[in-house]
């Protein structure tokens, strides 16, 4: 059955269907339709930040913690520019974040509209700007484009880094035709698959078999990819198989817990890390 609803309804419905339960945003004239649509979705908590950088940092932290895809929304002009620092950090750390950036109505591109960032007629080019701090950046040109561009953006973000969709206000308000829906305002088949997405887990047993041949204690240094892929259970399985102790890099310090009396967790590596890590590596504190 064919139905029609607004582009913003499609966006929040799709996000809810893949398990996203928070949207971090600063409201504004050219993003208010999306924010209002999120407010009326019981599955989504729309968090109102005081500054766009704060909203971007919240989305980044949400993703780093393993809660799911971090989503941030901001209006056009200066509001969108305030996202750049936060998205730059997400890009540097390869953190999955989806940024939904409002734009003035496309019909006014290059005609002196307030906060025009279309790149037309000498205006600031948001596409060029956000392409520098993202792994994927597209401007939604027609309402029907959202059906393909939104899953593409989410897939690109999940591969590691921020993805940006530029949303002109008239496109946000326009109606989009969709097929049979799953109750979340999005095509059932596509979202059902996306909702089950999870990075493939590796088998720890071949690694364990190799390391059992070594002499002495075994220490594992867990990197930030463990946190990004939520591979905490696999890390613990490997640690238990080896009887090893675990240290972490700073961006993965939550994956193994705090150092305790059982000695299973050594702490964080680096010059600002824990003494136990350096001592386990046979070096001086701050040297590992």
Q: Model segments located where?
A:
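N-terminal alpha/beta PP-like core and its mobile active-site loop of ThDP/TPP-dependent enzymes
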Residues: 1-288
């Amino acid at each position: 059955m064919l139905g029609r609803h607004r582009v913003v309804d499609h966006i929040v419905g799709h996000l809810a269907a893949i398990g996203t339960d928070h949207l971090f945003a600063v409201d504004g004239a050219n993003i208010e339709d999306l924010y209002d649509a999120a407010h009326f979705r019981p599955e989504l908590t729309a968090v109102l930040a005081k500054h766009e950088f704060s909203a971007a940092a919240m989305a980044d932290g949400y993703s780093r913690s393993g809660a799911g895809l971090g989503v941030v929304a901001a209006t056009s002009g200066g509001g969108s520019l305030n996202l750049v620092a936060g998205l730059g950090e997400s890009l540097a750390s390869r953190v999955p974040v989806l940024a939904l950036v409002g734009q003035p109505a496309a019909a006014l591109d290059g005609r002196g509209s307030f906060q025009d960032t279309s790149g037309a007629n000498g205006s600031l080019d948001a596409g060029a700007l956000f392409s520098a701090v993202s792994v994927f950046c597209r401007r939604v040109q027609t309402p029907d484009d959202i059906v393909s561009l939104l899953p593409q953006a989410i897939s690109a973000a999940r591969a590691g880094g921020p993805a940006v969709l530029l949303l002109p206000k008239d496109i946000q308000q326009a109606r989009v035709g969709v097929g049979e829906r799953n109750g979340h305002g999005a095509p059932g088949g596509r979202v059902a698959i996306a909702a089950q997405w999870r990075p493939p887990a590796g088998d720890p047993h071949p690694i364990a078999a190799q390391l059992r041949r070594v002499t002495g204690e075994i220490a594992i240094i867990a990197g930030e990819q463990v946190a990004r892929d939520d591979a905490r259970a696999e890390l613990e399985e490997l640690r238990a198989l080896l009887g090893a102790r675990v240290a972490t890099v700073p961006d993965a310090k939550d994956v193994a817990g705090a150092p305790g009396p059982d000695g299973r967790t050594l702490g964080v590596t680096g010059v600002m890390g824990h003494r136990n890590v350096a001592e386990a590596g046979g070096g001086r504190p701050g040297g590992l």
